[in-house]
Amino acid sequence: LGLTINMNQLRPNKLSDILGQKQVVEVLNINIKSAKSRSDCLAHTLFYGPPGTGKTTLANAIANEMGCSLQIANGANLRTIKNLLPYVMRVEDHSILFIDEIHRMTNIVEEFLYPVMADFKVDMSISGKEIFGETLSIDIPRFTLMGATTEYGSLSKPLIDRFQHKHTLKLYNKVELQEIVNINSKKLNLKMSDKASVFVTKVSRGTPRIANAALEWLRDYRIAQGSETLSE
C-alpha cells in the first residue's frame, strides 16, 4: 500500500515556500541576490538553533535558489582530515558544502578547514626523501561552506569568525506551525478535523520536523484503519 512517504516531499524547495523564520529568509534573499549579481558564491553561512527548525531545509532551498549543487555531511562523522577531504575535493564552482552538527568536528578537521574557508586552498603535508615536511597547496573552486549547530557555545571563535553570515533559527509559533500542518496534511492526502489539526500543532512543540513525522504516522494509521477523516 505504500504506507510511507519520502519526507523530502514535504520540504520546501524555495525560500518563498518556507513558513516562519521570516527575518532569516529576508536576509538570505538579499545575500543570494547580491551573490548572483556578482556571479559569486554565497559567503560562508552558519545556522544555529534548536533541532528540527529548518537548517537543512534552508540549505536545500538556498542551493535551489543559487542553482548549484549541494553536498551534505555530518560533523559527527568528520573525525579525521581523511573523512573531510572527499567532500572538499568534490566542491564545484559556487557549490555548497553543508555540515550538520558542525560542533562535533574534531579540532584537527576544524583547523584544516581554516585555509579552505579563507583562501579556497587545501594545504596538505607531503613526505619523501627530499621533500619531507613540505606542504602542498591546492587551489579549489570558490564555494560556500554552510554549518548548522544546536550548540553555538561549543564552536571555537576562530571557526565562528570565518562565517560571514550567521543566522539564529527559532522555534515556530502556533500560527506558523498550524499553517505547516494544514499544508502538509493536504500533500499527504490526509483529512483531519480542526481539532485533530490543532492537536498535532500542539504536540509538535514548535518544530516542523516533529509535525511532519506526526502527520506521516497519522497518514499511515488512516490507511491501515481504512478511515477517511481523522478526529482528535
Kindly give the residue locations of the regions a language model identified.
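Residues at the beta-strand->loop junction immediately N-terminal to the Walker
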Residues: 19, 46-48, 99
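Walker A/P-loop
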Residues: 33-75, 87-92
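Conserved AAA+/SF3 P-loop NTPase catalytic/coupling segment centered on the Walker-B
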Residues: 61-62, 81, 95-125, 152-162
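Conserved AAA+ ATPase core "coupling" helix
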Residues: 154-187, 194-199, 213
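C-terminal helical "lid" of AAA+/P-loop NTPase domains
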Residues: 198-202, 209-224
